[in-house]
């Protein structure tokens, strides 16, 4: 009998295939005490080592398939396996209480998970998920139980499961896995993000899919609407086959825009750039016709290792990106890291709210021994392309001045050492903090450009953690307050003959693009896979009409009014 279930649309596309149930393994165990505690500790450490080997393989495979920024989740998992704050209490529990390894692991990891989940904090929620995933793997090795392995699938299927861990998702074989559906998860969960990178249609958060589906059922997944159909009629299958064909045709049509200009119907040109994490992300940037790189996140150079990257290592990474972009602008964000990331070689304080604490430019100015090697590497690489440098989390004009002074010191040092340094490097800041937006006219006199980081600007302006379900309704990209701040920043930069870009998720949002175009945004930087859709939309719009739209939008009272207004202006685009 045909059924239809609604979930959260997580990754575009249509999948039609037989259901493959990802059965959760039996990880139950007896709570028996042990007499040989040394042997039990050895058993635990053996399971740890096997887990490290597995995760390293999965991480390397994920980097090849998805890029280093998506593989970074497994760097976090590997760090969990090295974390003495987790490992030592487990070993102590075995030795002091004669508890078996499985029970000790479960007790200690559950304590951490409970603590982290009780905090309304994005980082802590991710940390809890990391511990849960890693502990499950270690427990399976302790018990000698095999975890589900989606990579063994050898026929066209739709994966059905309670949830897909990052390691599950990274092992999906695109040749056979047509799509997946889960009980839990949201659009920003790790599995959803990875499914978009793999371009596998996905629907998450259905709550009950595993109870409704049996192995072998015919499943239709609509990753655009969040609809999941179980054993639909032949007529309905035919409709979705046509929808799938149209989806692929649309993708092919988009490819024709790869080398097209990002210009409105009335001749206004903007720049569409890509966000990247490492040089490994460059193929996607080039394939999707990016006109530059608007955000190069350098923190991935610092993660998944036990010592700070050397100046030479950083120089080679920056040089590779600049050379690959062949003279197109590359905007590099200096180190944006703090207490929310565990780096064993940095003595960072634990903070209740690391996103408002000791991080980014604050950390770099306080510890110039970390900052100077990065600045030197960037300056040395500057001769290999068109380099722009921006400082993150700048709250005051003095922070920008201090960062610029350090950079100029290192420029002078390098020239004295015989290095060549480009003399046309533009220096800018991320606008993520409301205080910076409020003083944009002051900053604009000294910086060369702004890049608006909307992910944080929205959170800080609305005082709402977007990962907290209870206040997620306040994470409103289209709120008139946000639009007014964006308008203020853009106008301040233009008054001084400077330019403004945007590198948050909002820059690639199909509802936001018409508004941003009307507000005068010069550069839109987004995930490489969003560029062609954004280009098509921009080419269908008139800048003059979008200016009128944005003028009306900033006078609205609510996000809903703004969305209705955008629909009114773009319905024929």
Swiss-Prot record:
Residues the record lists as binding substrate: 297, 333, 466
E.C. number(s) listed in UniProt: 2.7.3.9
InterPro entries: PEP-util_enz_mobile_dom, PEP-utilizing_PTS_enzyme, PEP_util_AS, PEP_util_C, PEP_util_CS, Phosphohistidine_dom_sf, PTS_EI, PTS_EI-like
Alphabetically ordered keywords of this record: Cytoplasm, Kinase, Magnesium, Metal-binding, Phosphotransferase system, Sugar transport, Transferase, Transport
Coiled coil stretches, renumbered: none
GO BP terms, alphabetized: phosphoenolpyruvate-dependent sugar phosphotransferase system
Annotated catalytic residues: 190 (tele-phosphohistidine intermediate), 503 (proton donor)
Compartments reported by the entry: Cytoplasm
Pfam families hit by this protein: PEP-utilisers_N, PEP-utilizers, PEP-utilizers_C
Keyword Metal-binding: yes
One term of GO molecular function: kinase activity
Positions annotated to bind Mg(2+): 432, 456
Bilayer-spanning residue ranges: none
One Gene Ontology term, aspect cellular component: cytoplasm
Top-level taxon in the UniProt lineage: Bacteria
Binding locations of phosphoenolpyruvate: 455-456
Principal location class: cytoplasm
Gene3D superfamilies attached to this UniProt entry: Phosphoenolpyruvate-binding domains, Phosphohistidine domain, PtsI, HPr-binding domain
Catalytic activity: L-histidyl-[protein] + phosphoenolpyruvate = N(pros)-phospho-L-histidyl-[protein] + pyruvate
Functional description taken from the UniProt entry: General (non sugar-specific) component of the phosphoenolpyruvate-dependent sugar phosphotransferase system (sugar PTS). This major carbohydrate active-transport system catalyzes the phosphorylation of incoming sugar substrates concomitantly with their translocation across the cell membrane. Enzyme I transfers the phosphoryl group from phosphoenolpyruvate (PEP) to the phosphoryl carrier protein (HPr).
Self-association and partners: Homodimer.
Further information: The reaction takes place in three steps, mediated by a phosphocarrier histidine residue located on the surface of the central domain. The two first partial reactions are catalyzed at an active site located on the N-terminal domain, and the third partial reaction is catalyzed at an active site located on the C-terminal domain. For catalytic turnover, the central domain swivels from the concave surface of the N-terminal domain to that of the C-terminal domain.
Domains as described in the record: The N-terminal domain contains the HPr binding site, the central domain the pyrophosphate/phosphate carrier histidine, and the C-terminal domain the pyruvate binding site.
Family statement drawn from the similarity comment of this UniProt entry: Belongs to the PEP-utilizing enzyme family.
UniProt-recorded name of the protein: Phosphoenolpyruvate-protein phosphotransferase
Organism: Staphylococcus carnosus (strain TM300)
Lineage: Bacteria, Bacillati, Bacillota, Bacilli, Bacillales
């Amino acid at each position: 009998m045909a059924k239809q279930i609604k979930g959260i649309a997580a990754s575009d596309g249509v999948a039609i295939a037989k259901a493959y149930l990802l059965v959760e393994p039996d990880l139950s165990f007896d709570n028996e005490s042990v007499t040989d505690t040394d042997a039990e500790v050895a058993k635990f450490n053996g399971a740890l080592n096997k887990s490290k080997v597995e995760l390293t393989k999965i991480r390397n495979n994920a980097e090849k398939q998805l890029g280093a920024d998506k593989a970074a989740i497994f760097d976090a998992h590997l760090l969990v396996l090295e974390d003495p704050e987790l490992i030592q209490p487990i070993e102590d529990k075995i030795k002091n209480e004669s508890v078996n390894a499985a029970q000790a692991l479960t007790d200690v990891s559950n304590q951490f998970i409970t603590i982290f989940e009780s905090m309304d904090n994005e980082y802590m929620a991710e940390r809890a998920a990391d511990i849960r995933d890693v502990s499950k793997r270690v427990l399976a090795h302790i018990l000698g139980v095999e975890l589900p392995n989606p990579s063994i699938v050898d026929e066209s299927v739709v994966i059905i499961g309670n949830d897909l861990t990052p390691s599950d998702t990274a092992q999906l074989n695109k040749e056979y896995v047509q799509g997946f559906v889960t009980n839990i998860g949201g659009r920003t969960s790790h599995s959803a993000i990875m499914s978009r990178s793999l371009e596998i249609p996905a629907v998450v958060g259905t709550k009950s899919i595993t109870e409704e589906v049996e192995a072998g059922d015919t499943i239709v997944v609509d990753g655009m609407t969040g609809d999941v159909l179980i054993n639909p009629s032949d007529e309905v299958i035919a409709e979705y086959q046509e929808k799938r064909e149209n989806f692929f045709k649309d993708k092919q049509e988009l490819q024709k825009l790869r080398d097209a200009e990002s210009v409105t119907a009335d001749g206004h040109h903007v720049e569409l750039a890509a966000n990247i994490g490492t040089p490994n992300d460059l193929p996607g940037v080039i394939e999707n016709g990016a006109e530059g790189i608007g955000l190069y996140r350098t923190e991935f150079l610092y993660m998944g290792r036990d010592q700070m990257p050397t100046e030479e290592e950083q120089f080679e990474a920056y040089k590779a990106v600049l050379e690959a972009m062949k003279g197109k602008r590359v905007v590099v964000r200096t180190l944006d890291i703090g207490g929310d990331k565990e780096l064993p070689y940095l003595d960072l304080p634990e903070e209740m709210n690391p996103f408002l604490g000791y991080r980014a430019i604050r950390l770099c100015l306080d510890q110039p021994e970390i900052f100077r090697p990065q600045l030197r590497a960037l300056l040395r690489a500057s001769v290999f392309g068109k380099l722009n440098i921006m400082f993150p989390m700048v709250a005051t004009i003095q922070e920008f001045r201090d960062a610029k002074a350090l950079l100029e010191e290192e420029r002078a040092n390098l020239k004295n050492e015989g290095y060549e340094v480009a003399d046309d490097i533009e220096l800018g800041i991320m606008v993520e903090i409301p205080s910076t937006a409020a003083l944009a006219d002051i900053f604009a006199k000294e910086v060369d450009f702004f890049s608006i980081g909307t992910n944080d600007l929205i959170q800080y302006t609305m005082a709402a953690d977007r990962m907290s379900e209870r206040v997620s309704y306040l994470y409103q990209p289209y709120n008139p307050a946000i639009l007014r701040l964006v308008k203020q920043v853009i106008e301040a930069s233009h008054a001084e003959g400077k330019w403004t870009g945007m590198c948050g998720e909002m820059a690639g949002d199909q509802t936001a693009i018409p508004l941003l175009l009307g507000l005068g945004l010069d550069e839109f930087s987004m995930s490489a896979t969003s560029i062609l859709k954004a280009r098509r939309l921009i080419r269908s719009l008139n800048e003059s009409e979008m200016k009128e739209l944005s003028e009306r939008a900033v006078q609205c009272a609510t996000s809903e009014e703004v969305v209705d207004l955008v629909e009114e202006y773009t319905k024929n685009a």
